[in-house]
Amino acid sequence: MALGPQFRRPTLLAAALALVATFGASPARADRCEDTAKELKNQIDGLKISVNTGNMIYLTHPAAKELSLGCRGRNYSVELYAKADRKPKPQFFELIASAGAIIFTIPKPDALTGTSRCIKRMGLLRGDKVSMRYRRLNMECTRTKTEASIVVTRGKDE
C-alpha cells in the first residue's frame, strides 16, 4: 500500500522546517561579560584579558596588582575587583574610574569620585574595611598592611 499525498506533505514540511532551523540559526554569540571585557580591553590602554573562567574574567594592567570582572553572582549582576598597594597611585584610581564608567554606564568623574572616596575613608577612625554606596553602586574597600582592594558591584534589582 503506497503512502498517500496526505502523509507526504506534513513529512516534507517538517523536514524543510528542520533544515531551516539547522542552517538558519544565528551563530553562537559570546555572553555579555565577555563583550564587556573586550570593550574594556579596547577602551583602556595597557589592559589585557588573561584568563576566562566560568563567570570570572581576570584582567591585567600595570596600575593594579589584581583586576577581575565577575558576572552574574547571587546578589549582583556585575562585579569589578581591583587590588593595589596600600596607598594607591592616581593611575589606579583612573583605571578603576574608566573601567567602572564602561561597565556600569555612569560618568567617569562620578566613578572616580566614588572609588577615591571609598579608598581614602579607610584609616584610624573608620577601620580597614569600609562599605559605602555611591550612585547606585555598592563599594567595599579593604586594606591590609601591604595592599588595598576595592570591589564595585551593582545589585541585580538595579
Q: Which residue stretches match the model-derived regions?
A:
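Bacterial N-terminal signal peptides that target proteins for export
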Residues: A2-A15
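Amphipathic N-proximal alpha-helical interface segments
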Residues: N52-E94, K129-E158
